[in-house]
Amino acid sequence: MKTPVTSKLQIGAWLLSLGLLTACDASEPPKPTASSGLVPTEFQAGETTFNTNCAACHGKQAAGTDHGPPLVHKVYEPNHHGDQAFQRAAANGVQAHHWQFGNMPKIESVTPGDVDQIVKYVRWLQRQAGIE
């Protein structure tokens, strides 16, 4: 005959085992997303350069501001504004044509390599938002 203490110990041991199995889940950790605030390592240089040179107008995570348009928008999808469009915009500036924010000046503080990193970061943000 089991005593109430023995039954409680068995139930406690079973629950502890279940808890340990759950804690030892071997699945991969969730992948970083823009909304999680975690940017994958390969896009962090672009994020830093974007934040220094672009975010004042284009906003945090390229979401736009009252000074410039969002780059995470279907207007800037790769099939409409390819990667070279970003290079030209940084090197030459852009005459306003989609938005009413005024013309974008050329950005002399970035190199073509910097723009490549910025584009990789922006494209990653776009993919996170379902813009392919």
Question: Locations of the language-model features?
Answer:
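Bacterial N-terminal signal peptides that target proteins for export
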Residues: 2-13
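C-terminal motif of bacterial Sec signal peptides marking the signal peptidase cleavage site
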Residues: 20-23
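Bacterial signal peptide processing site
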Residues: 25-27
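Short functional micro-motifs and their immediate structural scaffolds
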Residues: 29, 62
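Gly/Gly-Pro-rich "capping" loops immediately C-terminal to redox-active cysteine motifs
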Residues: 36-37, 41-43, 47, 63-91
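The canonical Cys-X-X-Cys-His
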Residues: 46, 50-60, 106, 118-122
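Short, solvent-exposed mixed-charge patches
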Residues: 131-132
